């Protein structure tokens, strides 16, 4: 199933994986997953974290090793409930819940994920997604960017 992903998608997932894999050992533990989830304002229980790991953990070793998320991502990208996941992701970015992602909100989330971006990089990300040119990203623009990945 992972063979349905493009090289670009695989390298993006590898980059995302490394944001979770804090110690760089090639495995994501429940502790590392919890750290990232909490940095995004979520508060999962240990059992929820273990369930998330189990959903992806193909070899049953209790952690997520890199190739494992690829099959999950290929499945998720085909899922019809991705609409709800997109709405949830948008809500994570849209801190003040005004229906728009501002440069400050984008910078905040990316910083929490460990991505130190310059103002220029954040502005460039906004510009790429900002179809109507109002300087922020609305839900429709967000969906376009996420579906284009």
UniProtKB/Swiss-Prot annotation:
Molecular-function GO term, any one: calcium ion binding
Keywords: Acetylation, Calcium, Metal-binding, Methylation, Repeat
Positions where N-acetylalanine occurs in the chain: 2
Any single Gene Ontology cellular-component annotation: myosin II complex
Binding-site residues for Ca(2+) 4, renumbered to this chain: 130, 132, 134, 136, 141
Keyword Acetylation listed: yes
Name recorded for this polypeptide: Calmodulin
Organism: Malus domestica (Apple)
């Amino acid at each position: 199933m992972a063979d349905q992903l493009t090289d670009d998608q695989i390298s993006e997932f590898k980059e995302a994986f490394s944001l979770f894999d804090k110690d760089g050992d090639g495995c994501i533990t429940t502790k590392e997953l919890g750290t990232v989830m909490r940095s995004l304002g979520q508060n999962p229980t240990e059992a929820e974290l273990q369930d998330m790991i189990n959903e992806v953990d193909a070899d049953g070793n209790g952690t997520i090793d890199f190739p494992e998320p690829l099959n999950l991502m290929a499945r998720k990208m085909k899922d019809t409930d991705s609409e709800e996941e997109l709405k949830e992701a948008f809500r994570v970015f849209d801190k003040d819940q005004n229906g728009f992602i501002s440069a400050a909100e984008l910078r905040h989330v990316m910083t929490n994920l460990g991505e130190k971006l310059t103002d220029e990089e954040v502005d460039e990300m906004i510009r790429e997604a900002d179809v109507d040119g109002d300087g922020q990203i609305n839900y429709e623009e967000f969906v376009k960017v996420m579906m284009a990945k």
